[in-house]
Every structure is written in structure tokens, then in C-alpha cells.
Amino acid sequence: MPYIVDVYAREVLDSRGNPTVEVEVYTESGAFGRALVPSGASTGEYEAVELRDGDKDRYLGKGVLTAVNNVNEIIAPELIGFDVTEQVSIDKLLIELDGTENKGKLGANAILGVSMAVARAAADFLQIPLYQYLGGFNSKTLPVPMMNIVNGGEHADNNVDIQEFMIMPVGAENFREALRMGAQIFHSLKSVLKEKGLNTAVGDEGGFAPNLGSNEEALQTIVEAIEKAGFKPGEEVKLAMDAASSEFYNKEDGKYHLAGEGVVKTSAEMVDWYEELTSKYPIISIEDGLDENDWEGHKLLTERLGSKVQLVGDDLFVTNTKKLAEGIKNGVGNSILIKVNQIGTLTETFDAIEMAKRAGYTAVISHRSGETEDSTIADIAVATNAGQIKTGAPSRTDRVAKYNQLLRIEDQLAETAQYHGIQSFYNLNK
């Protein structure tokens, strides 16, 4: 039978060498699920709370034994006897056990680990792939990868202010080809950087992290790498950016301090800058172009660029239906970044994706900078037919694990697999 007989959590390490939570769920039938929780470096002010121990003598205060104990001592006894396939009821119970708006009592890292492990155990019990369990028989869309190949900001120790510069192989015929294109461009970029005498060490998300003369130079260099790899920028491959601008926004003067360039800009000047960049380069997506609390700035950006550029809310919406509803009502952005640990349960994650789709917003399924070998987000991308996934460069096992899982899923789906390329941007006037 699919009844839960044990839930167990332990402290393990993520891709940055920091502790995170791993949860295992066991059932009477022998079905089993394991999940590992990711962690972010640049985090939104309104994200669900990730519990850290604060004991400076253990992992510099970043231990997660409190969250682990919350699973083992509080959550586990409540879940014994539950039917593992009752995801909605279990997630509801987890939310009620915590009882706070931001999951600050038990910790989103504790709650999410359980939520994901339960889903994996249920899929194991039913002997079906996770994406099919989560999404049903119509789960068949492979996502366009948003591949972070130049890292800056909080993800790298360099002078680049913009956190991520990405490529999107929209001209590929299928996911396999998209991944090949991305990998070839990645290697081409390494060659270009070497020729320029620049550093080819990689950052948290597997992309290169060189010191560059300006943020725009990153775009120029990537275009050069795309062409060197034999692809057409703007036609076969589009560019995307994650500014993560809350990281360089100064609350005291209300301006954006681009320290790498020694420039200070107002909201309106930032919008002008993005408009200039999108006119010069084939940029199809900008994430968190302005601070998470700069709603007027986001509204202006949407008015100016929203019909031709995907404007993704990450820190702005934090995978939260209340924040997203506010954005939809006020005409802010046209896309939401989906990070499971920003909200804490699979049910709430899927609610945010559904709300976005109903409003004509796209949903981009995303990793965190502190990742693990867990590939659940790959299955979520296919389960929800989201059409886009952001999970780093084709480098580092913690990133490649997601891409390899998508290759497996594409193989399993065979001729029913779909890859929509540029049509994934249904929020734009293409």
C-alpha cells in the first residue's frame, strides 16, 4: 500500500560546499522518494525563510540541523500513515504545521524537502516517471534552455554588475539539438576569452566569470562566440540577462550603482539603458531589471519593452501567487521565474505556474546558484509544459544533471516530445 511509514532528513552539502537538507520518504509498499533542497545567493526580500542554525562553529553558521530536526521530530510523526499520493493534502498539512506566512517556523528548506520527496515516492509507487505523475499524460513539452554562460554579480568574483548573461537556442529542432548548440557556444566562448587573455574560471552556475571592461562587453563577447560556433545570433540563438538589480540598488538614494562601470543610474535611466541594449543585441529576456520594490520602474520597463522582450520577475514575484497577482493587476512584467524553494511546496509552485499561464505570462522553471544532483526541476518543466528552463551553463555536474534528465525525458517521450523554440515566448508580439 502507498502509506508513509517513515520520513527522514539529513544534512548534506550543496554545490557551494554549504549544508542543505536531504529528505527521504519510505512507504509500506517499498516505494521510496529522495529529494535535496537548493539554496540561493541573491535572494528576494519576500522569499520563504530558509532556516540556518547560526552556529559560527559549524559551517560558519550555515548549518541546517534545525531544519533537519524539524523534519525528523515535528513533520515525520504527522505524516506516518498518509497516502503518499495525496500531494495536495500533505502540502496543506505542511503549511498548517508551520503556521506562518513565510514558513519561518519549520523552514522552507525543511518543508520543500518533504514535499518533493513525497512526490518522488508517489511516482515510484505508481511506477511512472516523475514528470508524468506531476503533470499527467499531456506532459510533453521540452523547455528551451536559458544557459548562463557569463556570470557576474553575486555569482562571481569579478567586476561585472549584471548577474547572468545567457543564451537561448530558439532555432533548434529539439531539446537535444538545443543542448548541443549551447555546449558548442560555451566551448567557443572559452576559446574567445582565451584569445583575449581573459580568465576562463567558472562561477557558481558554471558560466565563465572574467573581468570585462563593461557589462555590454559581455554581450559583445557572447555574440562573437555564437558566430564563431557557426550559429546566427538573433535567428538561431537569442540572448537573455538576469540583472538581479536589487543587488546593486541603493535604498538610501533610490538609485542603481553599477560599480563595475562606476556609473549611477535612476530607474528611468536603467529603462533607457535596457532599451538601448535590446536595440543593439538580440536580447529576448530580461530578469529583475529593477529592484524588487521599484514597482514604478518595473511598470515603466513593461510599458517600454513588454511587447518585444520577456520581462521576468524573480525577486519581484518570488514564486508567490499574491505577489504575482499584484504584478498582473498592475501590468508589471510578463513572466515569472519559478523557484521551488522560494515558496516551499510543490502545490504552491504549481499554483503560481497556473496563475501565470492564465494571465498570459510565461513561467521559467529555475535552479538556484547553490544546487545539488537533484533534478526535480527538469521534471517540473516538462510536467507543466512551461517551455523554458534556467539551469546554468552546460558545465558542472549540479547543472548538467538537469540537462541530462531532460535528455532522458525526451528519449522516453520519443515522437510525442515537443520543442517550441521561439513559440515558447507566447507573451511577446513576435
Swiss-Prot record:
The keyword Cytoplasm applies. One of its GO terms (biological process) is glycolytic process. It is an enzyme of class 4 (lyase). InterPro entries: Enolase (IPR000941), Enolase-like_C_sf (IPR036849), Enolase-like_N (IPR029017), Enolase_C (IPR020810), Enolase_CS (IPR020809), Enolase_N (IPR020811). Pathway: Carbohydrate degradation; glycolysis; pyruvate from D-glyceraldehyde 3-phosphate: step 4/5. Pfam families: Enolase_C, Enolase_N. One of its GO terms (molecular function) is magnesium ion binding. The keyword Lyase applies. Its EC number is 4.2.1.11. It is found in: Cytoplasm; Secreted; Cell surface. Its cofactor is Mg(2+). Binds a second Mg(2+) ion via substrate during catalysis. (2R)-2-phosphoglycerate binds at residues 163, 339, 368-369, 390. GO terms for cellular component: cell surface; extracellular region; phosphopyruvate hydratase complex. The active site is at 205 (proton donor), 339 (proton acceptor). CDD domains: enolase. Mg(2+) binds at residues 242, 287, 314. Keywords: Cytoplasm, Glycolysis, Lyase, Magnesium, Metal-binding, Secreted. PROSITE patterns: ENOLASE (PS00164). It catalyses: (2R)-2-phosphoglycerate = phosphoenolpyruvate + H2O. Belongs to the enolase family. Catalyzes the reversible conversion of 2-phosphoglycerate (2-PG) into phosphoenolpyruvate (PEP). It is essential for the degradation of carbohydrates via glycolysis. PANTHER family: ENOLASE. This is Enolase. The lineage of its organism: Bacteria, Bacillati, Bacillota, Bacilli, Bacillales.
